[in-house]
UniProtKB/Swiss-Prot annotation:
Lineage, highest ranks first: Eukaryota, Fungi, Dikarya, Ascomycota, Saccharomycotina
GO biological process, any: chaperone-mediated protein complex assembly
Gene name of the record: PIM1
Domain of life: Eukaryota
Reaction catalyzed: Hydrolysis of proteins in presence of ATP
Single GO MF descriptor: serine-type endopeptidase activity
Protein name: Lon protease homolog, mitochondrial
Ranges where the Lon N-terminal domain occurs: 183-406
Domain Lon proteolytic: 871-1059
Transit peptide: 1-55
Family: Belongs to the peptidase S16 family.
Length: 1086
């Protein structure tokens, strides 16, 4: 095309001359104008346009290459060409490849110009006088790289024909202030442009569009562009304040403008240079002070005053001087060039553009701007490059952004590559699998059924599934075989068939009903617990008689550490049944018991089906451990699920939500354990057969420690040879002073601690002996060496020395080589874990643990006193308590007068403390009421309760207390205070009191007896209603204790206050009340 040939010809001409920067910029503008003018596409055009003729004549006035004119005098300010013009021209030289963005896709109509290196004109060494000598030259926008264009009568768009007078008018800086006249100011939210690279911006404000048409008509197509600080501000084409934009912007020239759609005006601009904002006029200011201030002023762009746009007075910004030979700058330029080459190699679309940019390496400022314009960085980071006047800083910031972009490009490329590789591998594997499968089918190597279902068919041969389960199996198997191998539902079906065939359908272990063997197993594993063992043997004997053991639900309840779980294991061993355990702690949802439906991702069966799979039989002993830990307030659904599981009438058709077929649990022997029955819901408790496992007595604890705990601890510590001896008295003291609870866990811990400390002492003793023996052997060896020294003559020594051959080099090296494997073996043995050899303990080393040295092993005693009061004062009664952990203890009730009756207020009151809960507070209130009525009835002259201010306290205030069993203790304490008679310290009592004086039954008599004996009480008053429980309490527990059953409180009174006459009880508080009566009489007179 003619257009391309024109530009190419002009380039060839330029290559033969060294021209001034201004002329070079004019030539570049001419070539770009030719490429951008559509009328040049006319095939009838036969001569060069006027621009080419004019600039060709300018070229002829230049001197040929090598004859560079000398520097002339400095140009004056009136010429319109300042020092800034030359610097900026030099800075922007070579940017002739300005191609409007709107023409990038016009491949069919406009040919892409070739990049000609000759078009980049070197301007180094060109003096300012050479610019002065160019006739008719002018500096557009103060020396910017793009030259002015000719006049246009109506330049509304770029499709109007240009003529020879289309040059832009000259706009220069003021010689005094260095400022440009006011120019149109436009804000930009997108990334700010950098000098040397064209950009496009869309304008929607009608006033701004009108002003652009105006400056084009005036042949002054210049404006300034500033980046906004906050991109979230309203979408506007007017700058409303200086604070809303950055201070450094760009001075631009309009290259082309189009209207892509109604209401949108697209401007292709070319950034000429950096500029700083000196003053800003906004549409709002023009009506006020600013307009008044500028009235009468006359400047080249004064026509902008009448438009509702923002215009600014700007000052060109110069780069800081720099040294091109600086090592730092060269290093930065080379780094940028290398990274750009990498980017070009990875992105062929940008390869040509990057190649053009790398040719600017000799001009670091323009090279930095090129890199900043090329990369897609954060607009704020680009603005930092724009504001960087220090060339080294500008290069550093550009390098930093380029590294980030390259890293992101690498990550993106690797991600795409990995995804593509995985997809290719998947397709390859899929093809190979399908190919092999087809070959196997044709060769008849495999059956048509899927291999994955064959393992389930193999399991099915050994199972006796119900019809419902078999139907579900076949349906799921058919579904699985019909699914694609890569379907997500395939895994769901496979897991379901796996669980369904893992249930032991029809598999039962043979029960063993041997009473003798069962008794031996129970006695072997447990000492005492006669009642529990008898109940279990009765249960087994029923199975022996009937020939089967139906699914029973046993519940072993008792304090912690009494062996409930181990009893369940012994029952399973006695019956020859598999043992599985389900812990109830933490179960808060019914789905954990009955499973989740298969609609949920990752659903599994519940605990019951999982336990059957683990047992591999349909009649295991299934231990529901700590069923009282089931939180009824949060997991009522789980408790309701156990109503079905533990009901023999319903559990033959248990349905798990995941399996969704009926499973027979009627042959399962359920054994539950609980610490406190009160935490189990009544409907669930009704389905169980309760077996109470009471706490151990001291004698039982001693025997269990001797038979089980001490041998186990000695075995774990490696001291089985009788090296540690614990006396029976020591065990008894350990129980009395350290662990009074009903269970065995604490005493087990203490015995383990004894053996651990004993092992330390034994090892220290053995090592001390080994050290002594070693030192003795060394002394003996040294003495032997000293005693065996013989005299050797000089001649013999010389002969012996000569007989020793000096080793050769070969032999020495051979020895070194032979030693190397030894070194490696030594290193290898060091790295490997050394096997610990058991210490051989001499038989004479023995440790005796006695009552005297017991505290050296387990620390100081915890329970130092057996009773609080040796001789209790009046108002102190000894009650008995029983905790849910199975421990019996003494409970003291203390009552005092807060004021003497004579000096008090005369009003009766009672105050109760000691962390008492509601039931116990009511019991104290009932006791107070009954005590008053009892004193009025039996000691009418004792007016104690008419004016007594009483404080009742129960010690151990940190421990919450509840229950009615302290009723007679409260009453006895109050009556003791009223009669001023102390109670015997050896008498303890328990029982609920009513307002009529009736004593009602309470629980935990066995544990309370043990607690009373520990505190030295040999007489126990208890309700007559529970007298029959004494028959079930072992004799060793009742030994040394006098039991007094009572039905009314009068029986209690007769026991604690024998031989108390009426006169003695009536005379107690007479003097105090006489004082009180006199005090009241005197108060009335006043």
């Amino acid at each position: 095309m003619l257009r391309t040939s024109c530009t190419s010809s002009l380039r060839r001409v330029v290559g033969k001359y060294v021209v001034s920067p201004l002329v070079a910029s004019q030539i570049r503008f001419a070539t770009s104008s030719v490429r951008s003018q559509p009328y040049l596409l006319n095939s009838e055009l036969t001569e060069l346009p006027a621009q080419f003729k004019r600039y060709s004549s300018i070229l002829l006035t230049e001197k040929p290459e090598g004859d560079v004119p000398e520097s002339g005098p400095e140009p004056s300010g009136e010429s319109g060409i300042s020092e800034k013009s030359n610097v900026e021209n030099d800075k922007h030289d070579g940017n002739d490849e300005i191609k409007p963005e709107a023409e990038k896709n016009e491949k069919d109509e406009i040919e892409k110009p070739e990049i000609d290196k000759d078009a980049i004109v070197e301007t180094d060494g060109v003096s300012e006088s050479s610019v002065e000598n160019v006739s008719g030259s002018s500096s557009a926008a103060g020396g910017a790289s793009a030259p002015p264009s000719g006049n246009s009568n109506n330049n509304n768009n770029n499709n109007n024909n240009n003529n020879d007078n289309d040059e832009p008018n000259e706009i220069v800086t003021n010689a005094g202030t260095g400022l440009y006249p006011p120019l149109l100011a436009i804000p930009m939210k997108d990334r700010p442009p950098l000098p040397g690279r064209p950009f496009a911006i869309n304008i929607t404000d009608p006033e701004v569009i009108r002003s652009i048409y105006t400056i084009i008509d005036k042949r002054e197509p210049y404006f300034v562009l500033f980046h906004v600080k906050d991109p979230n501000e309203g979408d506007t084409d007017v700058i409303n304040s200086k604070d809303s934009v950055y201070n450094i912007g760009v001075h631009c020239q309009i290259i082309r403008h189009t209207t892509p759609r109604p209401g949108v005006f697209n401007v292709l601009g070319y950034p000429l240079e950096r500029c700083s904002l000196a003053d800003l006029s906004t549409p709002s200011e023009k009506k006020g002070e600013t307009e008044t201030r500028k009235e009468g002023e006359n400047f080249p762009t004064s026509y902008l005053k009448g438009l509702k746009v923002s215009y600014a007075t700007v000052k060109p910004v110069k780069d800081e001087p720099f040294d091109k030979t600086s090592t730092d700058i060269k290093s930065l330029v080379e780094s940028l060039k290398a990274l750009l080459s990498k980017m070009g190699a990875k992105n062929p679309l940008e390869k040509l553009q990057i190649k053009e940019g790398t040719e600017l390496v000799n001009d670091p400022p323009r090279f930095a701007d090129f890199v900043g314009s090329t990369i897609h960085g954060d607009p704020k980071k680009i603005q930092e490059i724009l504001e960087s006047l220090n060339i080294q800083t500008r290069l550093s910031k550009a390098l930093e952004l380029l590294k980030v972009e390259l890293k992101a490009s690498l990550i993106k490329e690797n991600t795409i590559h990995n995804l593509s590789t995985k997809a290719d591998e998947y397709q390859t594997r899929l093809f190979i699998k399908e190919f092999i499968k087809e070959l196997q089918k044709r060769a008849g190597i495999v059956e048509s059924d899927d291999k994955k279902t064959s393992k389930f068919d193999e399991r099915l041969k050994h199972l006796k599934m119900t019809e419902e389960a078999l139907e579900a199996y076949n349906a799921e198997k058919a579904k699985m075989e019909s699914q694609n191998e890569h379907s997500s539902e395939l895994g769901v079906s496979e897991r379901y068939l796996d669980w369904l065939t893992s249930i032991p359908w029809g598999i039962y272990s043979k029960d063993r009903f041997n009473i003798k063997q069962a008794r031996e197993i129970l006695d072997r594993d447990h000492y005492g617990l006669k009642d529990v063992k008898d109940r279990i043997l009765e249960f087994i004997s029923m199975g022996r008689v009937s020939g089967k053991v139906d699914g029973k639900i046993l519940c072993l309840t008792g304090p912690p550490g009494t062996g409930k779980t181990s009893i369940a294991k012994s029952i399973a061993e006695s019956l020859n049944r598999k043992y599985v355990r389900i812990a109830m702690g933490g179960i808060q949802d019914v789905h954990e018991v009955k499973g989740h439906r298969r609609t949920y991702v990752g659903s599994i069966p519940g605990r019951i089906i999982s336990a059957l799979k683990q047992a591999k039989t349909s009649n295991p002993l299934m231990l529901i451990d700590e069923i009282d830990k089931l939180d009824l307030s949060r997991s009522g659904g789980a408790s309701s699920a156990f109503l079905e599981i533990l009901d023999p009438e319903q559990n033959n058709a248990f349905v798990d939500n995941y399996i969704d077929v009926k499973v027979d649990l009627s042959k399962v022997l359920f054994v539950c354990t609980a610490n406190y029955l009160g935490n189990i819901s009544p409907p669930l408790r009704d389905r169980m057969e309760i077996i109470e496992v009471n706490g151990y007595t001291n004698n039982e604890k001693i025997e269990i420690a001797k038979r089980h705990l001490i041998p186990d601890a000695a075995k774990k510590a490696g001291l089985e040879g009788g090296h540690v001896v614990i006396e029976t008295k020591t065990i008894s003291r350990l129980i009395e002073k350290y662990c009074r609870e009903s269970g065995l866990r604490n005493i087990k811990k203490l015995i383990t601690r004894i053996f651990s400390k004993a092992s330390l002492k034994i090892v220290e003793e053995v090592e001390a002996r080994e050290g002594e023996s070693k030192s003795k052997s060394e002394e003996a060896k040294s003495e032997a060496i000293t005693g065996s020294v013989t005299e050797i003559s000089v001649e013999d020594a010389t002969v012996k020395a000569q007989s020793i051959e000096e080793p050769s080099v070969e032999s020495a090296s051979q020895k070194v080589d032979e030693a190397k494997p030894v070194e490696s073996e030594e290193l290898k043995s060091d790295e490997e874990e050394e096997e610990v050899v058991k210490l051989e303990i001499p038989d004479d080393i023995k440790l005796e643990i006695t009552s005297a040295n017991l505290k050296d092993y387990v620390g100081p005693e915890i329970y130092t006193r057996d009773r609080v009061y040796d001789i209790p004062p009046p108002g102190v009664a000894t009650g008995l308590s029983y905790s849910t952990s199975g421990n019996g203890d003494a409970l003291y009730i203390e009552s005092i007068l807060t004021h003497s009756i004579g000096s008090g207020s005369g009003h009766a009151s009672i105050h109760v403390t000691g962390s008492l809960k509601d039931v116990m507070k009511e019991s104290a209130s009932i006791a107070y009421s009954f005590a008053k009525s009892y004193m009025v009835k039996n000691y009418p002259e004792n007016r104690f309760f008419e004016a007594a201010e009483i404080h009742v306290h129960c010690p151990d205030g940190a421990i919450p207390k509840d229950g009615p069993s302290a009723g007679i203790s409260f009453t006895s304490s109050l009556i003791s205070l009223a009669l001023q008679k102390p109670l015997p310290p050896t008498i303890a009592m328990t029982g609920e009191i009513t307002v009529t004086g009736r004593v009602l039954a309470v629980g935990g008599l066995r544990e309370k007896i043990l607690g009373a004996k520990r505190y030295g009480c040999n007489t126990i008053i208890f309700p007559k209603d529970i007298e029959n429980e004494l028959e079930e309490i072992p004799e060793e527990v009742k030994e040394g204790v006098k039991f007094i059953p009572v039905e009314w409180y009068q029986d209690v009174f007769d026991e604690i206050f024998p031989n108390l006459s009426s006169d003695e009880g009536n005379e107690v508080w007479k003097e105090e009340f006489n004082k009180l009566d006199k005090k009241k009489a005197s108060n009335k007179k006043k």
